[in-house]
Swiss-Prot record:
One of its GO terms (biological process) is menaquinone biosynthetic process. This is 2-succinyl-5-enolpyruvyl-6-hydroxy-3-cyclohexene-1-carboxylate synthase. Belongs to the TPP enzyme family. MenD subfamily. Its cofactor is Mg(2+); Mn(2+); thiamine diphosphate. Homodimer. It comes from Chlorobaculum tepidum (strain ATCC 49652 / DSM 12025 / NBRC 103806 / TLS).
Length: 582
């Protein structure tokens, strides 16, 4: 076979094996050096792919797809800075244990570090943020195709093994890059006959169950049985089953459950929004848990960590399914590397339900105060009322993606827990960046196969503006709600706001760009409701149309700060005197 035929077969084998390993969705950015890979994907009828003019957007789209499916999307790009544009998404995927596969085309050996065009050091470009990084040889009959297949299988396994994360395969190609049908009778291809006929992967792998050890469960059951004021914290979870199991355990034992938005259970009607209570210092001093079991990873708000720093529990236990360190305050006394669902199941019946610690009247009163101060239909729609209305209307068959900074905090704090079934919610909280949010939400929606609402701030929106090109299609529509306070409002809540006269200039970065013009540029419908009543009606209708829509909610940073402070001032007395026995 000539070089064209060898390269064509080489890439066809890679793509086919990825599909057989259930990594059959490809995010491709056009380029010359990646021609063999791109055409191998396009030529395989089982491959699903989407083209992306921007590699950075493609990387975040793949991240969102992984969040929805638990499987890696495959990124394909040409050589040079193309692969470097994946870096932010790779970092987020690594930090939050999301699978991802990067296939970067590269120049051959003789074109590296000699001044040749579009050639950089691509091998191991992502450093410590990959689970595995490997450079394949240039296509050639000296390399057995069996070794190519087993390498692809190992890449998928490393991406999915705990902790899941990105894997990078760098693939050098020599010109000519155009395809040519290979000779199936060539001796080099002969060992593939059985594999081709089977339709099965070259090799399989079994994922570990990550059951807790009997000894650790005995210890944990004893701690809970002896605890006087236990507390469960549900942080970010890798799947819905974990969150539901933890919620069921908390209910059966009567243990208060601080459920973060990333846990997947915060919006459930069975969930108590302890975030509101933990804002109040008097409540925190009175509550003082002695045993805390933290299921999963990060939480959005600072309230629980600050409370536990002031009143350290006797035992702080972390339950996670992978060995990554999670001890940001260096106060963890026991770590269980196991599935949260498995641990929750093993703890059932370890004690009688905890008496008291309910505060039902307080939470009912707090809910009424929030609705009265922020959500009356005639009032202007705000950064507090918008997430509360969204959480109350988005139901089964719909999903929610929330951007970082204030949208995440306000949804976590003020969302209405009314969903009859846990609403699928996702955030990029691995490193909590504001970049690539629209792209991630679009990938999340595509992976779920569900229409999705994105709640996002104006700076995050502008940061990923070109991703709006992903929305003008009829499938998996995205409702984008832009909370436009003309800058970074979160800085108004930070100590720096009172310590400098350069808040706007150096931190808030005021902007006056037109959200409406951006929507028009990308052919997306646009609306700008003024009141809560208008927004409620508009959003309820949007949920039924199955069409992408950008809703701009205009806000003033000073008024937003005042509303947050006024609301907290009204809520504080409720929890200062809360009767936790009811």
């Amino acid at each position: 076979m000539n070089s064209k035929q060898i390269t064509t077969l080489w890439c066809a084998v890679i793509v086919e094996e990825l599909i057989r390993q259930e990594a059959g969705f490809f995010c491709i950015s056009p380029g010359s050096r990646s021609t063999p890979l791109t055409l191998a994907v396009a030529s395989n009828p089982k491959a699903r792919f989407r083209m992306f003019p921007d590699e950075r957007s493609a990387g975040f789209y793949a991240l969102g797809y992984a969040r929805a499916t638990g499987m890696p999307a495959v990124l394909v790009c040409t050589s040079g800075t193309a692969v470097a544009n994946y870096f932010p998404a790779v970092v987020e995927a690594s930090a939050d244990a999301q699978p991802m596969l990067v296939l970067s085309a590269d120049r051959p050996f003789e074109l590296l570090e000699c001044g040749a065009n579009q050639a950089i050091r691509q091998q191991n470009i992502f450093g410590s943020y990959t689970r595995w990084s490997f450079e394949l040889p240039e296509p050639g009959i000296a390399t057995p195709l069996a070794s190519l297949l087993s390498t692809v299988d190992h890449a998928v396994r490393k991406s999915l093994s705990l902790p899941a994360g990105p894997v990078h395969l760098n693939l050098p190609f020599r010109e000519p890059l155009e395809p040519e049908a290979p000779d199936p009778g060539h001796p080099w291809a002969a060992p593939l006959e059985t594999w081709q006929a089977s339709g099965e992967p070259w090799s399989r792998f079994a994922r570990p169950l990550h059951e807790p050890s009997a000894e650790s469960i005995v210890t944990l059951r004893e701690l809970l049985a002896q605890a006087e004021r236990p507390l469960f914290v549900a942080g970010s979870m890798s799947n819905a089953a974990d969150g539901e199991a933890v919620a069921a355990l908390a209910e059966s034992l009567g243990v208060p459950l601080f459920a973060d938005l990333t846990s997947g259970i915060r919006l459930s009607s069975d969930c108590t929004p302890w975030q509101l209570a933990f804002q109040n210092e008097a409540f925190v001093e009175r509550f003082q848990p002695d045993v805390v079991i933290h299921f999963g990873g990060h939480v959005i708000g600072k309230q629980p960590a600050m409370a536990l720093r002031k009143q350290p529990p006797l035992h702080y236990v972390v339950v996670r399914e992978h060995p990554g360190r999670f001890d940001p305050d260096h106060n963890v006394t026991l770590t269980l590397e196991a599935s949260p669902a498995a641990v929750a199941s093993a703890l059932e019946g370890c004690r009688e339900p905890v008496p008291g610690i309910r505060c039902r009247d307080a939470f009912s009163a707090a809910s009424g105060i929030i609705d009265k101060m922020a959500c009356v239909p005639e009032l202007a729609v705000s950064e507090i009322s918008a997430p509360r209305i969204v959480s109350s209307l988005a139901g089964d068959g719909h999903a929610l993606f929330v951007a970082n900074s204030m949208p995440a905090r306000d949804m976590d704090l003020y969302a209405a827990p009314v969903a009859q079934k846990p609403l699928q919610v996702a955030l990029n909280r691995g490193v909590s960046g504001i970049d690539g949010i629209i792209s991630t939400a679009a990938g999340f929606s595509a992976g779920l196969g569900k229409p999705t609402t994105l709640l996002i701030g104006d700076i995050s929106f502008l940061h990923d503006l070109n991703a709006l090109c992903l929305l003008n299609h009829p499938w998996n529509p995205l409702i984008v709600i832009v909370l436009n306070n003309h800058g970074g409002s979160i800085f108004s809540f930070l100590p720096i706001a009172s310590q400098t006269d350069r808040l706007d200039e150096c931190f808030a970065t005021p902007q006056n760009f037109s959200i409406e013009s951006a929507a028009r540029t990308f052919g997306i419908d646009y609306a700008c409701p003024e009141t809560n009543g208008d927004f409620t009606q508009l959003y309820a209708e949007a949920l039924t149309t199955k069409k992408s829509l950008i809703i701009e909610i205009r806000s003033d940073r000073e008024k937003n700060l005042l509303l947050h402070r006024s609301l907290k001032a009204r809520l504080d007395p409720v929890f200062e005197k809360a009767d936790c026995s009811r």
